[in-house]
Curated annotation (Swiss-Prot):
Taxonomic placement: Eukaryota, Fungi, Dikarya, Ascomycota, Pezizomycotina
Keywords for this protein: Cell membrane, Membrane, Transmembrane, Transmembrane helix, Transport
Annotated protein name in UniProt: MFS transporter asaE
Function: MFS transporter; part of the gene cluster that mediates the biosynthesis of aspergillic acid. Probably involved in aspergillic acid metabolism and transport.
PANTHER family named in the record: MAJOR FACILITATOR SUPERFAMILY (MFS) PROFILE DOMAIN-CONTAINING PROTEIN-RELATED (PTHR11360:SF224), MONOCARBOXYLATE TRANSPORTER (PTHR11360)
Entry GO terms, CC: plasma membrane
Membrane topology: Multi-pass membrane protein
Originating organism: Aspergillus flavus (strain ATCC 200026 / FGSC A1120 / IAM 13836 / NRRL 3357 / JCM 12722 / SRRC 167)
PROSITE patterns: MFS (PS50850)
Biased segments, Basic and acidic residues type: 17-34
SUPFAM superfamilies cross-referenced by the UniProt entry: MFS general substrate transporter
The encoding gene: asaE
Compartments, record wording: Cell membrane
Induction or repression: Expressed during the earliest stages of maize kernel infection.
Location of the region described as Disordered in the Swiss-Prot/TrEMBL record: 1-43
Transmembrane segments: 47-67, 89-109, 119-139, 150-170, 177-197, 206-226, 252-272, 288-307, 319-339, 342-362, 381-401, 413-433
């Protein structure tokens, strides 16, 4: 891929930027026409554009913010509602949530490219809220699988991805910080939901804690329905052919990025799902352990903002790679030996910060290497590949834990290796796109 970032067929993937090939703009005095010079260039700001980001923030809060709280439900189900079942069996509930949120990607992406964002968000709001309401009256394992693991997750997929794709159309030069800003919604949700649900379960019971959460989500998604919209009407031309749908799989940078992101999914969600359970098993007070996921997600907020800001300056792939390497090293060097309160808390905080780029920069990576009109579909493909990891991460981790007789070391090693292995694929994608150039902004 050359510096103008064209696909193998020579199509324009992203308008060239004058500073694209360098860390410092001053090193490249000859500036090529930027996106602001193009007739249909994204405005990169303005009230409407930032209102789209506000609405997308609400969808992030209600989708990934909710899913980032799965650790609190894993712990509650193991100790109360489903305590007669094994950890590996219970873990299929959060695994299905993650799977359907990601696996619906290509379907939601094509629906967005055809119909725009608003109708998808309306439909997604219904399924997300309805699923949580049904979970509030569930008492059996299969009922929770259907309501929380499938119905709610399908709704969450239909609200989040259209918002991401809509933001891509409104921003180009500031795309990194725009994505980082909206992705902080999942961090804030990941802080608020675990604490809120934990306290509500103690005071009003599991049923009403789910209903109150559903009403809160309904209110925020009402804001998203009003504010999130596409910048241009959906195209009215013929439907894309099979050849066009397969085109992304002919682009090496895109394929390697998909594979890397899938492996990263295995590594990222194991700490999120198991940090509370492992801390309690190591002797941490259950009340203190319940704050670990909020700590992780709170630190992730700053990691996402920092990664987004730095990515616009130094390159999205570059910053994504650095952050993922740090996350993998933290798992292997800090989480494995962590058996007391202090190192576990430090790990949760630092890992939350380092893993923030996994959510905030992944859509920006795809937008960078894709034609704007295909961003929805290609982002969906990214999520589809990630869904494989999302579906199998917790069951694999639970099986590793069970085979090790309750020793968490092997599970932690698996998480760290997947993080570094996925990062190796992303590094390969960067090399394919730029060659062996360390200082290239990419």
């Amino acid at each position: 891929m050359d510096r103008s970032r064209t696909s193998s067929q020579g199509r324009d993937v992203l308008p060239p930027r004058g500073d694209e090939g360098r860390i410092s703009p001053s090193l490249d005095k000859e500036k090529s026409p930027g996106p602001e010079d193009q007739p249909d260039a994204p405005p990169d700001g303005g009230l409407t554009a930032w209102l789209v980001v506000v609405g997308a923030w609400c969808t992030s809060f209600c989708s990934f913010g909710w899913v980032n709280s799965v650790g609190i439900f894993q712990n509650y189900y193991e100790s109360h509602l489903l305590k007669h079942l094994s950890s590996s069996t219970i873990s299929w509930i959060p695994s299905l949530q993650i799977f359907f949120m990601f696996a619906m990607g290509p379907i939601v992406g094509k629906l967005y490219d055809t119909f725009g964002a608003r109708y998808l968000i309306i439909g997604g709001t219904f399924f997300h809220v309805f699923g949580l309401m049904m979970a509030s009256i569930s008492t059996q394992y299969y009922q929770l699988l259907l309501s929380q693991g499938i119905c709610s997750a399908i709704g969450a997929a239909a609200i989040f991805q259209p918002a991401l794709s809509a933001v891509s159309a409104w921003f180009n030069r500031k795309r990194g910080i725009a994505f980082a800003t909206l992705s902080t919604g999942s961090s804030v949700g990941g802080v608020i939901f675990p604490i809120m649900v934990d306290r509500l379960i103690a005071k009003v019971g599991f049923g009403w804690s789910m209903r109150i959460s559903a009403f809160m989500i309904l209110f925020l998604l009402g804001i998203a329905i009003v504010t999130v919209k596409a910048r241009r009407p959906p195209p009215q031309g013929p439907k894309p052919s099979g050849v066009q749908l397969l085109q992304p799989f002919k682009e090496p940078v895109f394929i390697v990025t998909l594979l890397g992101y899938m492996l990263l999914t295995y590594g990222v969600f194991i700490p999120i799902n198991y940090v509370i359970v492992q801390a309690v098993a190591s002797g941490m007070n259950a009340d203190l352990a319940s704050y670990l996921v909020p700590m992780l997600n709170g630190a992730s907020l700053f990691g996402r903002l920092g990664a987004g800001f730095m990515s616009d300056r130094y390159g999205r792939y570059n910053i994504f790679i650095v952050m993922c390497i740090v996350a993998g090293v933290l798992v292997l060097a800090l989480w494995i030996p962590a058996t007391s309160n202090a190192p576990i808390i430090v790990f949760a905080t630092l890992f939350g910060f380092a893993s923030g780029a996994y959510v905030s920069l992944s859509p920006a990576l795809i937008a960078q290497i894709s034609p704007l009109k295909e961003v929805g579909y290609r982002t969906g493909l990214l999520f589809l590949f990630a869904s494989v990891g999302g579906l199998t991460t917790s069951p694999i981790a639970g099986a590793i834990l069970q085979n090790a007789g309750g020793d968490y070391t092997h599970m932690k090693i698996f998480s760290g290796v997947m993080l570094l292995g996925g990062t190796a694929f992303i590094i390969t994608a960067r090399i394919v796109g730029t060659g062996l150039k360390l200082v290239v902004k990419y």
